[in-house]
Amino acid sequence: MPLTLTDSLEQNIEAMQTLFAHDNTFVVRRTESPAGLRCAVFFLDGMVNALAINQSIIRPLVRADRSRLTADALMQTVIQVNDAKVVPDTDQMLSALLYGDTVILTEGDPRPVAVNTKGFSMRSTSEPDNERVLRGPREGFTEVFMMNLSMLRRRMNDPRLKLSFQRYGGATGTVVCLCYIEGVTPPALIDETRKRLDTLSLDGILDANYISECIRDRTDSPFPTLGETERPDVVISRLLEGRVALLIDGTPVALTAPCILQECFQANDDYYIPARQAGLSRILRVLGFLFSALVPALYVAALCYHQELLPLRMLLAITAARRGLPLPALWEMVLLLLVFELLKEAGARTPGLIGSTMSIVGGLVLGQAAVAARFLSAPAVIIVAAAAVTGLSVPKLQTAALVIRFSLLLAGAAFGLYGVAVGALLFLAHLCSLRSFGQPYLLNLIPRVRAHSEDSWTRRPWSGMRKKRFLAREDEP
């Protein structure tokens, strides 16, 4: 329903009450000063700071010494709040009202004044559960948009940090902030991000994933082509590398672009510990991912087609453990992997410590019982458990590891090691074809620029880094 404001205060009040009919949180407060100044104050109960409204808006209005004031004069001489503005149209007025501002209308002037009186409840800052660190800042984003922006400003006191707002999402009118550093982020990347955001046609945006699925490259790929984080220090670090970040109102998750494969093997505290320790940790993560994705398939392929590759004692031990089992090696491995994934999902959905306890105890009890009952073999249980544990070292690639694991497992069961090799080459070709906001997904896989080699599979000490650039050119020294 379109809203039109006039010079008549009573007509404006009636129009606002009609628009917010059957909404018990909508409050209208009429005021009139001894001099005859008549105003109406509108706000939504539960979204505002009532004390600020009483002291900074209503009290000055009832003490005004003039009988008529324009919106500009009201804002400059009466309202005692620094964040107040004359709103040019009703759409912006309603948006401000719904977001927790207080709107003031006066007799004789249809232009509303919006005053920042937000006072809704919010969660305090805490360390993100999914990005805990052993050393470094422990502050994480919250669901409150402006608080998240203040965390960025506090970490980077530079006017080159640009924060550009835009509303998306139709009914929800969700504010999305495009963050970049002027002079560091390539203009082409900023334009590409804005172009993708302008294609959003969602009726509502309630989480960062709504936007991520719409603007990322290759939504069918199991590899992440858009970075996600809940930590302000990570966002600032990626902005300094020349990337862009998106902060979405109502969610603690920030999106960063471009995203490359190397980023998935980097942890938050790699930059807060000695360089050699960080480099060793990164290499271990790479080995853990490869073990998690490849070893189950290699086990089945070797057991079914290439037993001559196994040491004799190992082959005899596996054969003895599998004697009398009802399932072939392939289905044994598939069943174990599925049970583990179900236990992991159940643990994630169960609240608190019960979930992690249930996953550990459930895996131990079921595995021991299955081996004791001669339903599954102990080597298969060991391999699945090792693959599951090593896969947890790279949480950003858990989905990719799962897809690769099952795909290569089927290929290895059908064609042996040749199937595993061909499947691995197909996944490598897929990685080569991926791009993230115009950048190759395997960028810096083999560093050709010094700025790239300073922080790739390992990193140099901070004394050896010059400028930590993500999109360095080959002509840079």
Regions found by a protein language model. Name each.
Residues 1-294, 312, 431-477:
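Membrane-embedded alpha-helical signal segments
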Residues 378-380, 385-477:
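Hydrophobic alpha-helical transmembrane segments of membrane transport and translocation systems
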Residues 246, 259-408:
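Transmembrane alpha-helical segments that form the functional core of multipass membrane systems
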Residues 157, 323, 416-417:
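Amphipathic alpha-helical protein-protein interaction surfaces
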Residues 157, 198, 344, 371, ...:
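Short polybasic/polar patches that bind polyanions
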Residues 171, 254, 358, 385, ...:
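Positions that flank functional sites
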